Amino acid sequence: ADEVPALAGHERRVRRLFDALRGRELASQRIHGDFHLGQTLLGRDGWHIIDFEGEPLKSLAERRRPDSPLRDVAGMVRSFGYAAATATGLAPADREDWELTCVNAFVGACVDTDEPFVGRDDTLSAYVADKAVYEVLYEHRNRPDWIHIPLNALERLVALGTSD
């Protein structure tokens, strides 16, 4: 919040998402670490996931450290958000509908349920919030004109998962 004042308004609610995870035992395994739509290819025989090198700015030891697979799910959830936010030719409501359809289909396939997930499961919501906060900092430093994308996502997420 010090570097990006716009985060200050979300700090308490985001911390509540993280605090809800304290003491929980979460499954961990080797993960992709930088999973987003740009790391997928559609071939004749289906979808392929590429570039398992992890987050480029992390050390090799950090990239090899087991983590929750929900970190990769959160990365893809946020990737759908970026795709929707930058789509042209669609009304804002249609972009949001497309994003929610993609997120619910993807997460539903990951957890084998048809129930809407983001905003209802505090574990995944915390990982999505963590990714969105990272994106706010990234955009602030590198693409300030895009900072609204993760800020809007963070606003929607904390509105779903918490109350003041």
Model-derived segments and spans:
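ATP-dependent phospho-/nucleotidyl transfer catalytic cores
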Residues: A1-G33, G43-I49, E55-P66, L70-R71, ...
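A structural motif corresponding to the C-terminal end of an alpha-helix
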Residues: A109-T113
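Catalytic-loop Lys-Pro-X-Asn motif of eukaryotic-like protein kinases
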Residues: L37-G38
